[in-house]
Amino acid sequence: MVDAAFGRFDLGRAEDYRHFLLAQARVLLPLEARLATALHLPFRPRGHLLASDLASLDAVVPEPLTVEGLDGEEALLGALYVLEGSRLGGGMLARRVGPDLPRAFLGATHLRGEWRTLLAALDAAGETEAAQAAMVSGARFVFNLYAEAAGRPLAIA
């Protein structure tokens, strides 16, 4: 669903790639700021890489979407799962970026063991049905934000 919303961008074309990065920034930047102040799990932010790529394309960082309502450790873990999951696809998407376009953001793939560490943290935090439901809710919240940012609201329930 979100893949389809972002799949309409031709990453080989500078204008499409710029719009793709602008949509990413509307979600990633405020979400990383929220996670940095509220989550007790280390993660490697990519917002500075995204801002750098945008600057290279003469694009101004856009107005962020609100992440208000994303509360609680488990919901934030669900949100982080979506952000870190996007790193997995980012490395593949980087190959589709035009040769003269910046790709620091998409090229920031996981370091050895990072993904497994996150999955272990999710497993440890998800020992109850309530915790699992909160993680799923946080993930859905972020998927919906990304769909909105891409111009295709989805309302994933």
Give the ranges of each region predicted by the language model.
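Metal- and O2-centered redox machinery and metal/ROS homeostasis
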Residues: 1-157
